[in-house]
């Protein structure tokens, strides 16, 4: 292994991890989506993936969102989260206190969500959507859900 190899993550060596957020899909299939990690392990709670470029300042992954998929509202207390749409369209919701924002992200659109805001998404298209997800810390704190959301009651195992 040389230094260059340790800094490159090739698509051909990635796998779509449908289990990264499986506890959500087990609760309701509408939450089924796949993470493909490139740099760091992201904010899904996965920590044992050694097939990534080590994160130094942020994480970088893609998410495959089937048609009708919903990403439940969640909050990152420690990091900015950036979404960049590669394919498809999603409805993005952002909420903090009494402030509520909603927009449609299409191909090549970017949204930045600061720490401390709830964010959720829904694939409004008839085909799968693909988006880049970046979190602004090499080891983000696992996000949590609004207290009244059913997923907030589920205990998930560490991976």
Could you describe each region identified by the protein language model?
Residues 48-54, 71-77, 94, 102-104, ...:
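Short histidine-centered beta-strand/loop micro-motifs
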Residues 62-63, 74-75, 80-85, 103, ...:
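His/acidic/aromatic-lined binding-pocket segments of jelly-roll/cupin-type domains
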């Amino acid at each position: 292994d040389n230094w260059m190899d340790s800094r490159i993550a090739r698509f051909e060596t990635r796998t779509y991890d449908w289990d990264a957020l499986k506890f959500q899909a087990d609760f309701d299939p509408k939450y089924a989506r796949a993470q493909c990690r490139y740099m760091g392990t992201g904010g899904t709670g996965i920590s044992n993936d050694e097939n990534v470029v080590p994160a130094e300042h942020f994480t970088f992954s893609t998410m495959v969102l089937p048609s009708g998929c919903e990403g439940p509202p969640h909050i990152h207390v420690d990091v900015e989260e950036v979404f960049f749409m590669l394919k498809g369209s999603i409805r993005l919701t952002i909420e903090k206190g009494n402030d509520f924002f909603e927009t449609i992200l299409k191909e090549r659109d970017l949204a930045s969500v600061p720490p401390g805001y709830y964010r959720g998404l829904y694939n409004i298209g008839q085909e799968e959507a693909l988006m880049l997800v970046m979190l602004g810390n090499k080891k983000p704190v696992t996000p949590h859900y609004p207290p009244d959301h059913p997923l907030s009651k589920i205990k998930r195992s560490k991976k």
